[in-house]
Amino acid sequence: MSFDLDAVRAQFPALAIQDNGRRRIYLDNPAGTQVPGGVAAAMSECLLQSNANLGGYFASSAAADEVVDSAREAMARLLNASSAREIVFGQNMTTITMHLSRSIGRLFQPGDEIILSRMDHDANVWPWVLMAKELELEVRWLPFSPETFEFDLHDLDELLTDRTRLICVGGASNLTGTLNDVTSICARARAAGVLSYVDAVQSVPHVATDVQAIGCDFLVCSPYKFFGPHQGVLWGRLDVLEQLEPYKVRPAPTDVPGSF
């Protein structure tokens, strides 16, 4: 399928910026995309028309509630969530993961095990390592082949024990571009009664993402990887989110998703 490349480029004001008379080239584009004019306009309108705390009994607060509710509905459609209540917004994926690790950790006991991967971005590694240190958990590492840059799921089968409580894995590697078979990994986790946490920051921009088909318990992504604002999004299975005790101040909502 062909498309008008010039028309697409025209949607991104940042592509018209020049330095010393030459068009700017964004070599860091994989780390974060530029936003289309429509996104910048929507963000500007939000700041001008609905810049207020949520949950208030006045017009700008009601408008802010509507913006957030609409955004949750949009992300729920993108990820095929069963409910917009399963969508949580945060500063970025790293911050969300660090925050959620504090809540998930309350489910575990000293001596429990978690499985991490050295293929993953540190945002899906270090929060869990810190959690493990604080709670006296054992970290087990899922290796990958240095030839194929893929996981051998037989290795995962050997790592799973009756003490395993959590598996954290990336949907796609930001280093090698490997698309991991997260559906099979999450199926093994589910069969063993283990929670699964998928870092889909690099995969959501490139492949259709269906959390129901993947079968994970949590999935995180970053809208600024696909032309949105610099923010993080967590999808969590509603019944699992409702089991967690969120880290929050007392005035914050008590119900999911606002409690997170």
Language model features with spans:
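Pyridoxal 5′-phosphate
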Residues: 1-260
